[in-house]
UniProtKB/Swiss-Prot annotation:
Belongs to the DapB family. NAD(+) binds at G8, A9, K10, G11, R12, M13, G75, T76, T77, A99, T100, N101, M102. The active site is at H131, K135. GO terms for molecular function: 4-hydroxy-tetrahydrodipicolinate reductase; NAD binding; NADP binding; oxidoreductase activity, acting on CH or CH2 groups, NAD or NADP as acceptor. PROSITE patterns: DAPB (PS01298). Pathway: Amino-acid biosynthesis; L-lysine biosynthesis via DAP pathway; (S)-tetrahydrodipicolinate from L-aspartate: step 4/4. SUPFAM superfamilies: Glyceraldehyde-3-phosphate dehydrogenase-like, C-terminal domain, NAD(P)-binding Rossmann-fold domains. HAMAP family: DapB (MF_00102). InterPro entries: DapB_C, DapB_N, DapB_N_CS, DHDPR_bac, NAD(P)-bd_dom_sf. This is 4-hydroxy-tetrahydrodipicolinate reductase. Keywords: Amino-acid biosynthesis, Cytoplasm, Diaminopimelate biosynthesis, Lysine biosynthesis, NAD, NADP, Oxidoreductase. The keyword Kinase does not apply. Its main location: cytoplasm. It comes from Campylobacter jejuni subsp. doylei (strain ATCC BAA-1458 / RM4099 / 269.97).
Amino acid sequence: MIKIGIYGAKGRMGKQIEECLKSETQAEISILYNKGGNLEELFEKSDVIIDFSSPSGTHELLNYARTMPKPLTIGTTGLDEKILHLMQSASKVMPIFYATNMSLGVAVLNYLASKASQMLRNFDIEILEMHHRHKKDAPSGTAMTLAQSVAKARNLELEKVRVSGRDGIIGERSKDEIAVMSLRGGDIVGRHTVGFYEDGEFLELNHTATSRATFAKGAIKIAIWLSKQEAKMYSINDFFRNLKCVQL
């Protein structure tokens, strides 16, 4: 049995992963780690670690991992460039998987949105994400991943064209503008819409998650797979290509 350590075990995703692991036949829980716990014990007793914590938590995890390399499956969102750079550096000595969303449906949405962005170059792009009232970061990591994909498909720098809100008399929408909007309320697990709008028609691509178990089960499958991989950086596409279930 592969021993999985859960880093950020008290969070919503941490609790969901713990629950899903109870019925997993290939893996079991080694340590439930929360802030202030024993990192040395986490690394010693785990074959692979799943991280759904916070940006500061992920930063701490990566720093410690350099002293005791272990496969890391990271799903924490809101990471800045400093942490992403640290992640890339650490992946030279251990396998690291990072994704802002670990569902097959979102991977396909990202692929389709990129293709649509290329094919519908004259269409305006707007992205809307909806989550529960407790979500701390905005826009969601998934929304930003989608925005990066559609911008890249048009050879645009997202930082120069992204709009995160509109208010007052702001003038007409610019040609290359990509809006990323956030809604928060209730217990919405996650809904992402990428819309392409032109005079007389529009196309909207949607993905809705109805249970966190979708992401938890995905994270567990990825962690099991990652435990057998060599040191490098991995993405959701690497995982799905390995399964040969979809070519992205």
